Amino acid sequence: MAEGYDAALSVAEWLRALHLEQYTALFEQHGLVWATECQGLSDAGLLDMGMHLPGHRRRILAGLHRAHAPPVPLPRPAPRPVPMKRHIFRSPPVPVTPPEPPPTAGEDEGLPAAPPIPPRRSCLPPACFTPTSTAAPDPVLPPLPAKRHLVEPSVPPVPPRTGPPYPQASLLAKEELLLPSVSPRSQPEPAETPSTLLPAFPQGPLQPPSPPPCPPVIPPKPPRLLPEFDDSDYDDVPEEGPGAPASVMTKEEPLPSRVPRAVRVASLLSEGEELSGDDSEDDDDHAYEGIPNGGWPTSGLNPPLRSLIPDLPLHPMDELPGGPTPITPVIKAGWLDKNPPQGSYIYQKRWVRLDADYLRYFDSNKDAYSKRFVPVACICRVAPIGDQKFEVITNNRTFAFRAESDVERNEWMQALQQAVVEHRARFRLSSASVLGVRGSEQPDRAGSLELRGFKNKLYVAVTGDKVQLYKNLEEFHLGIGITFIDMNVGNVKEVDRRSFDLTTPYRIFSFSADSELEKEQWLEAMQGAIAEALSTSEVAERIWAAAPNRFCADCGAAQPDWASINLCVVICKRCAGEHRGLGAGVSKVRSLKMDRKVWTEALIQLFLHLGNGPGNHFWAANVPPSEALEPSSSPGARRYHLEAKYREGKYRRYHPLFGNQEELDKALCAAVTTTDLAETQALLGCGAGVSCFSGDPAAPTPLALAEQAGQTLQMEFLRNNQSTEVPRLDSVKPLEKHYSVTLPTVSHSGFLYKTASAGKPLQDRRAREEFSRRWCVLSDGVLSYYENERAVTPNGEIRASEIVCLAVSPLDTHGFEHTFEVYTEGERLYLFGLENAELAHEWVKCIAKAFVPPLAEDLLARDFERLGRLPCKAGLSLQQAQEGWFALTGSELRAVFPEGPWEEPLQLRKLQELSIQGDSENQVLVLVERRRTLYIQGERRLDFMAWLGVIQKAAASLGDTLSEQQLGDSDIPVIVYRCVDYITQCGLTSEGIYRKCGQTSKTQRLLDSLRQDARSVHLKEGEQHVDDVSSALKRFLRDLPDGLFTRAQRLAWLEASEIEDEEEKISRYRELLVHLPPVNRATVKALISHLYCVQCFSDTNQMNTHNLAIVFGPTLFQTDGQDYKAGKVVEDLINHYVVVFSVDEEELRKQREEVTAIVKMRVAGTASGTQHAGDFICTVYLEEKKVETEQHVKIPASMTAEELTLEILDRRNVSIREKDYWTCFEVNEKEEAERPLHFAEKVLPIVHGLGIDSHLVVKKYQSMEAMLLYLASRVGDTKHGMMKFREDRSLLGLGLPSGGFHDRYFILNSSCLRLYKEVRSQRPWSGAPETSHRPEKEWPVKSLKVYLGVKKKLRPPTCWGFTVVHETEKHEKQQWYLCCDTQMELREWFATFLSVQHDGLVWPSEPSRVSRAVPEVRMGSVSLIPLRGSENEMRRSVAAFTADPLSLLRHV
C-alpha cells in the first residue's frame, strides 16, 4: 500500500511533510531523490550523511517504519460508552470474570464468524445489545471517509481574495455529486457497496447497564488566557466526534490510550502528533479513518499524493466577476450545541452563523471574531445523527451540532444544503463567464506568528484585504481556519523589535515574529491590506467597462486593478510590482482603487478609448508564444518580459516612419490634432519627440497643438508622457550583463561579530554587547553565518548577487574597533566587527571580490571607504539610466560604467554643484565637476541615503587648511571665491572696503556657514553687507593654521621685500611663488588679482595700493602690523601683478572690461533707485484684521520683526508704555493658530512663506510678562511633563484622521523635544530623565515652529493647546497638536520653547526699545577707522582692529 500511495513522492515533499525540509539538499547530495530510495536508511547512515540531531533522525526513521511496515490485521475497537441525557446517569459496568475475558484484537482470525455489528450513530460509540431488546436496531449511517493528514503541495496554495482558502480537493472530487434531500424524519440508509461495510467490532456486554449511584465527575475546563477570544477550540486535537471522558470509565474498562485504533493508510507523511509535537492526541481523531463518507468509493476520495496537487487553482474565487462583493448577508444564525474537540459529553453552546460563503461559530452572538470557520465550498454532506443532532461533513473533518428541536435541526440542514448547492452553481457560472474570474491570488504574506493568548504559533495569511488565522499550515491548505480579520477596520502599530499590534474596534491582536526583518515585512503586508480594504472600486469598474481592460495587458490575469498611466495599459498587481522596477521613466504605476485623486475624468476616458486593446496592438504585436506571460509566471519571467516589451520595445509594431526623426515629429504634430490616440501612441513609442518643435510659434509643441485643437484626451496622453524614455534595443540593464559573466570564486571563513540586521541607517553607536559571535563562511557566492563552527544549519545567509554596497566604518565607530557594513537589495543592513585590523581588511577584500564583476575589479586596487553599485546617468546617455560601480576613497569618487571608458576620479571637493533633485520617493543626486555631470538615482533608499551622506561629507571641508577646503576649478577655495565674487559685484565702489569691519556676530555666522558648506552658501545683496563679507574673508585668511604663504616660506617672502633691485626682487617673488603648494599659489593669484581691481577704483572707494597693503599685510602674514614688511610684500605683488603672475595683455584687458561693466551697472541701478530690488511690499494689520487697520509696508531683506513692529506703531502714532509688549504675530486662519515672531527674526522669509490663509498682525502680547517672570525664576533650561498629544497625518495617504488625543510624556531640553509613551521611571527629576529609556519620537527643537492654538475641528480636550510644525530638509511638513491642562502650564511650555530656540534671549533689553527709528540698511557703511591720514595713524588703526574689533565701537 505504501508503494501505491507514495511511490511518486519526492524526498523534498516527504521531508516538507515531516517539517524537516532543511535536509532536502543533504539527501539529494547523496543521490536520494525519491522517498522509496530511503527505505534502507539506518540511524548510523543518517549520522554519516551529516544529520547530527538525534530527534530528527528518529522522526525520519519513524516515518520510514510506518510506510514500509507489513500490514497488520484490522483490530477491533473496544466498546465505547453511549451518551445519555444529562438527567440520566449510567450504572457502573458489570465486571468481567477472568475465565470469560473479552475478546482482544488479536483473536479476530480465530473467530468462526464476525459478531453482529452494533448500531452506531455516526461519531457516537456503538450501542450495546441487550437480550430483552425487541426494537429494531437503529439504522447504520453511511460510513465516513478516511481522514487524510498533511497533504501538502510543493507550492503554497493561494487563498481567494474575499476570504480564507478553500480546499481544492473537496471542489474537484465532489463537484458533480448532488446532496441528498433529507426529510424531517428520514434517516440515510446504508449503502450496499462493499466499501461501506464496517469492520467487525467486539460484541458488547449482554446485560443492560444499571444507573450509577452518582453522576460522573466532569473535568473542569481550563481557564482562558483571553476571555474574549480563547483558543479552547484550537487545540492540537482536530474536531471530530466525542469520546468518553476518563472520569466515567471504571478500572475494568480499557483506558483511552489502550483502545486499538483503526488501521491507517501507510504513508511516508508524518502523523499529526509528530507535527504538533504533542503526544497526547485524542482517540476520536481517528474515529472515521478508513471509513468512506456517504457510501462514495474510497478510491475516489483517496487519490495518490500527486493528484492532490493539481494544475488548476487551489482556491477558486467564488464571487461573480466585477470586483469584490459587499458584505455577504447572513442566511441563518442561532444558538446550537457543538461537540467539543476533546470528545467531552458536555456540549458547548455556540452562536452559529451561516452565510453564502462560510459557516462560522462564535462564543456568543456579540463576538466579532469566530472560533472556527468552515467554507461552504468545503462541505461535502450534511447528515442527521439522531435526535436534534446533525453533522457537517467536510473532506477532512466532521463537525457535530445539536439543535433545540428536530424542526430547528432540519431547518439548519436545509439551509446548509441549499447554501452548498447555490455555491457550486455560482462557481460553475463564474467559471463559464466570458468575463473570467480573478486568478488564484498568492498571499501577500503567509507564515507562522506567535499570537498572545495562544500556546502554539498560528499560521497567518495576508490576502487581499483580509488577515486570516489558521491553526497550522495544514489547515491553511484545507481552508478551515480560526477566523479572519477585515482590514477596513484594522490598524497596525510597531511595539518593539519583533512585535506588533493589529488593532480593531473589537480586539487587539498582539503578534510576535521571529526576527526584526520578518516583523517589518509583516507590517508592510498588513498596511497594504489596510490600503486595499479602504480602496474603492468605482474607477476600476468604469475602466473595466472596456472588454480588453478586464484582463492584465501583460499576463492576462482577470480583473487587474493597477495601471501604467503613461503607457495607458491596465495591469495586475504582480505585474505592477515589476513595472515599478522599470522606473518612472518607463512606466508610471498607479492603483485603480487607491490612487483616487490621480484618476481625473480625462484620464479615465483616455483608458476607455485607448487602454489594453490598442496598447497591446502596438506593444505586443510580435510576442512569440515562448516568451508570453501567464498569470502564474514567476517574477523573474515577468521582469524579463516587461524589460523587453517596454524598455527595449522588442515586441512593438514599428511605424512606417521609424528611423526618420524629422518625419516622426511632423506626423506626431499632425496626429495630436485628431482623435487618433493609437497613432499618437505608436509615434511616441517609435521615437517621436514629445516636445518637438511644431514650426508654429503660436503653438510650438505637440501639447500646445492639441490644446489649440481642443483634443483633451491627446493633451492628457502627452502630459503623462513628457518624461517617458524612448524604447531602445540596447537598453538592457547592465546588471544582466554583469552577472552573465562568471564571477571569481572566493572562499573565506572565520569568526565575525555581527548585530541583527536593520532596515534603517545606523544612527547610534552599537555597543559591544549588541554584537554576537558567529562563524562565517564565504563560499560559492554566499556569505553564511552559523551559531558556531560545528553548526550545520546556518542562522542566515547573504548572497553576493544581492549585495549592493560594502562600507568600511571609521575606527571606533561602534563597540569593535574595526567594523564594516553590508547592504543588500532587500533594503537590509548587516553590521560586522572585529578587533584585528588585518582580519577585518581581509574579510572586506574577500566580500568585495565576491560581488564586484570583472569590469569593475580595478576599483579593488586601492583601499576604499565605500564600494557598490548605483543606477545613474552620465556622459552622453542621459536619457537611459545604467548601473554604475562606485568606490569612494577620501574625497575621490571613482566610477566604472559598463558601456564607457575608464574616467578620471571625481574630485568631490572640487564640485561645482552638489544638489538633490526630485521628490522623496525618486531622489536624484546631481554632481557637477568641470564639464562632467553625473546623476545618481535613489532606487533603493537605504544604501542611497548612506551614499548621499558620505558623498556630502567627503565634498565638505575636511579641516582648516587651504588644501582641505572645498575647491573650485582652478584650485581656489570656494570660500575665497564666494567672498571675492560678491565684493566684485557689490563692493568695488564701497568707501573703505576692507578697511571697515562688519558686525562681529554677523561676520562669525557667515564664516561658520561658509566653513561648513561654502558651496551651498549664496551671498545676496540685501541679505549680507559687503563689510560683513570682507571681514569674513580677512578672518578666514588670518585664521589659516599655516597661513597663505606657509610658515616655512613666510620669512623668505618678508626678506625678499627688502631687496632693493626691482628686477631681482620680482624674480625672487616669482621663484617663491613656484614653491608654494598648488592651492596656496592659486589663492594668492586670485586674491592679488582682486585687490588689483579694487585699487583701480581707489578714487571712489579710497582704497589705493598702499591702503590695501596696510590691511592685508598683517592678515596674510599673520603679524601684529607694527612693521611694514608684510605690507610691502602685498604692495609689491599688487604693483607688479602682471609681471609676477605672468598675466598677458589680453587677459588684463578682459578683466578690466568686466570690472568696469559691473561698476557701470551698479551706478546706473543706484541712479534709477532699483538697487533694492529684493524689497517686498506686504500688508500688515494693527491688532486685528480689518480694512481700516491695514498698513502696506516695504520690507527689505534685513528687516526684523522688532523693526516692523516699531514702524507700524510709528505710522499709527501708538506710544509704547511701560510693560507693553508689542509683537508681530503670524496668524493662520485655517489652523486657527498664531505664532509670535521673535524680535530678531527676519520678516521677509516669513512673508514669502505666507499662504492665502495667513497674515501678519502687530498687537500686544499679553502673556509675555508672565513668561518672562517664569523664565527668570526657573532653574535649568529643561521642562518635562504630561500633555495631550495628537498627530496630524494621513493614513497611508488616504486623508483619514489618525485618532484623538492621547496622554504622552514630553521632555524638552536644549537640543530636542522628546515624546515618550509613558513615564517608566518614578525617580525624582535629575535634570536628565531622557537617559532612562529610548523615546518614541524625537525632534530637533530649533527646527520646530510653535503656534498657539488648536483648530476646533479636532475637538481638543482643553482650550490651552498649541500646534507644533516641523519642516524637514526636503521641505516636508509634519504637524502635531498638544494640549495642556491649564493656561499657566501652556505659558511655561511656550516660554521654554522660545528660550531654548533663541538661547535664552526671549525679549530684547530695554535700551534697544528706546530708539524708534528704523535702522538704515547700510548702517554698516559708517567708517570705523580713518580713511585718510598719516601712515602711522592707519597702521595703528589696523593694529587695533586685529586686537579687538569691538573696542572701535566705544565712540560711535
UniProtKB/Swiss-Prot annotation:
Report the gene knockout effect. Answer: Progressive retinal degeneration from postnatal week 4 with the fundus developing pigmentary changes, retinal vascular attenuation, optic nerve pallor and outer retinal thinning. Defective phagocytosis in the retinal pigment epithelium. Conditional knockout in the retinal pigment epithelium results in optic nerve pallor, attenuated retinal arteries, retinal pigmentary changes and outer retinal thinning. Conditional knockout in Mueller glia results in mice which are phenotypically indistinguishable from the wild type.
Residue numbers of Phosphoserine PTMs: 232, 430, 740, 1430, 1437
Residue limits of the Rho-GAP domain?
A: 956-1141
Highest taxon of source: Eukaryota
In this chain, the stretch annotated as Disordered covers 87-258, 271-304
Q: Where is the SAM domain?
A: 6-70
Please name the InterPro entries in this protein's record: Arf-Rho-GAP_ANK-PH_domain, ARFGAP/RecO, ArfGAP_dom, ArfGAP_dom_sf, PH-like_dom_sf, PH_domain, RA_dom, Rho_GTPase_activation_prot
Q: PTM details?
A: Phosphorylated by PTK6 following EGF stimulation which enhances EGFR signaling by delaying EGFR down-regulation; the interaction is mediated by the SH2 domain of PTK6. Phosphorylation promotes association with the Golgi apparatus and endosomes.
Which GO molecular function annotations are given, in alphabetical order? Answer: DNA-binding transcription factor activity; GTPase activator activity; phosphatidylinositol-3,4,5-trisphosphate binding; R-SMAD binding; RNA polymerase II-specific DNA-binding transcription factor binding; transcription cis-regulatory region binding; type 1 angiotensin receptor binding; zinc ion binding
User: Chief localization class?
Assistant: cytoplasm
Per UniProt, residues of the Arf-GAP domain are 537-662
User: Which Gene Ontology cellular component annotation is one that this UniProt entry carries?
Assistant: Golgi cisterna membrane
Q: Where is this region: Required for interaction with SH3KBP1?
A: 81-90
Q: What is this protein called?
A: Arf-GAP with Rho-GAP domain, ANK repeat and PH domain-containing protein 1
- Its source organism is Mus musculus
Lineage, uppermost ranks: Eukaryota, Metazoa, Chordata, Craniata, Vertebrata
Q: Which gene encodes it?
A: Arap1
